[in-house]
Amino acid sequence: MLLHVIARGKIGRSPEAELVDRYARRISWGWKVTELPDRGGTVPPPSHTPSRTVAMDERGRQLTSSEFAAILGRWRDDGVRETRFLIGAADGHDEALRESADLLIAFGNATWPHMLARAMLAEQLWRATSILAGHPYHREG
């Protein structure tokens, strides 16, 4: 399954970009990043179907890493070919995008800078795929 991160803003050569790259290199699933301008630009349609869309949103569900992995594993096993992860700019997502998403998730109750959220998402995607592969990286409790 392709993991497609669609993010507002250019990450450039920042410390966050180094973290994203570090985790992206470890992910054995397909990986793609599309950067959009902070304002304007349209979210591209899925490259593959069937697909799922996950919007990173402060109002979203707070999942454990194992719960997140289970969702991705279920989608993969159901034949989903692409999961798109949408990260908004400073003002987040509009209501239409939230409503069209298959899942809204949040990394806790705090609000995170979108560049840091991208690095956190990359780590959680690595963790989820490692859980599904039976890799010892993740430890519960």
Swiss-Prot record:
Task: Describe the family membership recorded for this protein in Swiss-Prot or TrEMBL.
Answer: Belongs to the RNA methyltransferase RlmH family.
Reactions it catalyzes: pseudouridine(1915) in 23S rRNA + S-adenosyl-L-methionine = N(3)-methylpseudouridine(1915) in 23S rRNA + S-adenosyl-L-homocysteine + H(+)
Q: What's the short name of a Pfam family annotated to this entry?
A: SPOUT_MTase
Q: Which cysteines are joined by disulfide bonds?
A: none
According to its record, what are the GO cellular component terms? cytoplasm
Q: What class of enzyme is it?
A: transferase
What's an example of a GO molecular-function annotation for this chain?
A: rRNA (pseudouridine-N3-)-methyltransferase activity
Keyword annotations of the record: Cytoplasm, Methyltransferase, rRNA processing, S-adenosyl-L-methionine, Transferase
Chain's gene name: rlmH
Q: What does this protein do?
A: Specifically methylates the pseudouridine at position 1915 (m3Psi1915) in 23S rRNA.
The record's HAMAP family line, in alphabetical order, gives: 23SrRNA_methyltr_H
Assembly and interaction partners: Homodimer.
Protein's name in the database? Ribosomal RNA large subunit methyltransferase H
Quote the subcellular location field of this record: Cytoplasm
According to the UniProt entry, what is the EC number of this protein? 2.1.1.177
The answer to whether keyword Translocase applies is: no
Q: Which residues bind S-adenosyl-L-methionine?
A: G88
Query: Which species expresses this protein natively?
Result: Novosphingobium aromaticivorans (strain ATCC 700278 / DSM 12444 / CCUG 56034 / CIP 105152 / NBRC 16084 / F199)
- Looking at the keywords, is Methyltransferase present? yes
